[in-house]
């Protein structure tokens, strides 16, 4: 009999995987960025493994790295998520499809329309990852000289969310009567004009897409700063975070769920999915050897550049074999910066060691071992309220994905921790989330 609490599994995937050197690993697909057949194979494998969702991160600029590091990066280019995911919807039936869209460098009408369309095309499997953009270079692609200040980005994001969800509620679920005899296509009493005028946004509406199948696509958030946690507690239904140990995971889980209670939201209406970088082997030693080989393929310039991006500060001129000095505040991601600073101080890491870590597993929790040891750790996190599931990162593709689906998933199922079949038809139903009521009808 299945346990009362079941793991939720998302897949955090970039075309050639998360690890900086994944594209160089033996058997990897180095051309995956623009090879649709590879994406099709990835999502169909995820669906075979009964994953809840495929999550596609996105940036609206090339990463802010020196050219000696940038030229080694396989993530410099990728498909636009909201162009790719509708195509992937056609080759899948159950897998949720979550795309990133920035609230800083988009307009809410565009976002509402695209995600509503994706939800209809996928028969109710869309999710919106709400981000405020951490890459300062994005500003220069949208007519700005400087990135919008962190607090201002989150204030705009809160209003942006209200507008987008309001636009999704433009129509009652039964507005489109399509009466052939009378010639009436929709009931005019069941259309709402939003007419929003706020601090940052002015949007009239209504949306020219029917209400999404799920009511709203699932709302996802990934910020772990104070502002990010509060926004998640108020609005999110899934949150991605990146603690690298159970204690930090439990602390984050309790904090966000506690904020929800204070806001009158059910704690079950938000799923906390920390990132987990998973390497599978027949033995722990074999799994570690895979990780060691992968890490050996990371050029030092790439590791230093990745660390600089995460800290929002160029560390290339620092003593690489010395401790991380005090790093000034920046307008990049505050949660990523703070996590790495805390880790460096706590574990007495040198700048070089920290760069190797970030360039390898993206600063996430590492689960390196056999199917049994990995399942044991996942079970402990779930049972001790460190998470509701995981946003799994694969070390290389397709091999790392195949290892997880073919070896770890059966062990999780054997322990009655994970589904054998999908429970519902929509992403909300599979995540155990309610369908939002229309606020206007």
Regions found by a protein language model. Give the residues of each.
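N-terminal beta1-alpha1-beta2 module of alpha/beta enzyme domains
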Residues: 1-91, 214-217, 340, 441
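Acidic (Asp/Glu)-rich catalytic clusters
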Residues: 2-4, 47-48, 85-93, 119-125, ...
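An alpha-helical appendage that flanks or caps ligand/catalytic pockets
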Residues: 2-18, 151-214, 247-254, 258-380, ...
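Hydrophobic faces of well-ordered beta-strands that scaffold small-molecule active sites
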Residues: 7-11, 54-56, 95-101, 124-130, ...
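Conserved, mostly hydrophobic/aromatic
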Residues: 9, 46, 50, 88, ...
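Hydrophobic, small-residue-rich alpha-helical packing segments that form membrane-like cores
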Residues: 10-13, 28-37, 74, 84-97, ...
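Active-site mouth loops of central-metabolism enzymes
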Residues: 22-37, 100-109, 145-147, 213-226, ...
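Alpha-helix-loop-beta-strand connector modules within alpha/beta enzyme cores
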Residues: 69-97, 261-263, 401-420
